[in-house]
Amino acid sequence: LEGISKIGDQLMNQGGASEVMSLGIYGWFFEQFVGKQGLDYANNGNGRDDVATAVDFDKNEAAKNILTEWQTLNQEGYAPIVGKGGDAGLADFSAGKSAITLGSTASLKQILQDVNGKFEVGTAYFPKIKESDEGGVSIGGASLWALNNQDPKKLRATWEFVKFLISPESQAYWNAQTGYFPVTTAAHEEQTFKDNIAQYPQFQT
């Protein structure tokens, strides 16, 4: 985020945007900003060493770093308050009002449809808070769960449905329609996947 200040004026004066960045207030974004710093969201190693019992971002300065950079961008006029939710900043971007927005891959198809060729949509990796950060993002969004209800017939039927959902064909279609990553790299060999990448190269990011 700290690098946005360096290009803010250029985007507004030369790029024609009235906002530099439309960034919604959304919990998943906060989680990723913590992860990009390489810091833990919760104690006990993010719950990997033992059961997490409390958040850690208020002690390891992760939250402070996020809010400090965000407040700076807001005070400089580069990141106005656009509302709560993961889609809060998308409308301004799709309308050409803001130069940059933030979203997961699951937002990409909707953005491309909303922009509808009015301007070129570029994609990039999830931003860091500081240039020196060396962390990464965590998974989020749709997950597939099967519960053990002790009924053998239902469990067999559930497993058949799960196999259908995680098949390369289904995952290629799922990726093309939503932007979510396919859970199997075999989906990359499906024509649906290849056609989508050819039409929308932004999905490669």
Language-model segment annotations:
Residues A124-F126, N175-T205:
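Long, aromatic- and glycine/proline-rich binding clefts that accommodate carbohydrate-like moieties
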Residues G3, I81-A95:
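Short helix-initiation/N-cap motifs at beta->coil->alpha
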Residues Q75-E76, Q113-Y180:
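Extracytoplasmic/periplasmic substrate-recognition and gating elements
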Residues G3-A52, S98:
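Extracytoplasmic/periplasmic solute-binding protein
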Residues L39-N65, Q113-V115, K128-G136, E189-D195:
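Short, solvent-exposed loop/beta-turn-alpha elements that line the ligand-binding surface or hinge
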Residues V20, A99-S104, G122:
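Paired acidic/hydrophobic, glycine-rich loop segments that form the ligand-binding mouth/hinge
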Residues Y26, G86, G103-L108, G141-A142:
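Beta->alpha turn/N-cap motifs
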